[in-house]
Amino acid sequence: MIAAQTRHAAGVLEDCARVKQSIVTLDMEGVLTPEIWIAVAEKTKLPELRRTTRDEPDYDKLMRGRLAILDQHGIKLSDIQAVIGSLRPLAGAKEFLDELRALVQVVILSDTFEQFAAPLLRQLNFPTLLCHRLVVADDRIVDYQLRIRDQKREAVAAFRRMNYHVISAGDSYNDTAMLKEANVGFLIHAPDNVKQEFPQFQAVEAHADLLKLIKGAM
């Protein structure tokens, strides 16, 4: 009896392993929405805030620099949130995401922060977002807390351990670990330096082209 149950359980697990159940992970900024820090740089006329993960692969170095600039110029969380409230998703992003979510489960893996994301998520019909959190005191951003280190890659690795076929897309240096960990990875809207350093990832510029690639990889 026990042996039969064991064989049955093994058979069920084997059947599960044969089923290719896909999940898609996407970066947010630069893929679905404008780059928040570039928008803040334009509003505050501080060009040094234009530096993003497209330019700097060391995320902690990038964020420490941003926090120092904000402190130096007295820029508060509410100032940044006002800028974010004026932003709209990239052209075609909502339609792309709506169609994709009708086909497959989608998770947004972003190095943005909970306190930044809500206005943009609302316009995208509230997709699932995993991101980090700011430490705020009296409206001043004093620090940031990572969800976990290397959260994009770790999330993809966890999905793969759950027997998901993971398809990932991003645009920046901080997405490349996620793309490497995924079963299939694509670049969209990536700058030339990222495309040149990571030629193994097919690169596209249009959401329609990315949707075709994802459908083909499922």
Regions found by a protein language model. Give the residues of each.
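Alpha-helical substrate-recognition element adjacent to the catalytic core
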Residues: 2, 13-133, 137-138
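A short, conserved beta-to-alpha structural element at the edge of catalytic cores
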Residues: 51-61, 195-206
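Acidic, Mg2+-coordinating phosphoryl-transfer loop and its flanking beta/alpha structural elements
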Residues: 106-111, 164-205
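Short, well-ordered alpha-helical microsegments
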Residues: 114-118, 175-176, 211
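Substrate-recognition "cap/lid" segment bordering the active-site pocket of phosphatases
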Residues: 115-166, 197
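Short, acidic/turn-prone active-site loops that include or flank metal/cofactor-
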Residues: 132-136, 190-194, 208-210
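Short amphipathic alpha-helix with an adjacent loop that forms part of the alpha/beta core around
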Residues: 212-218
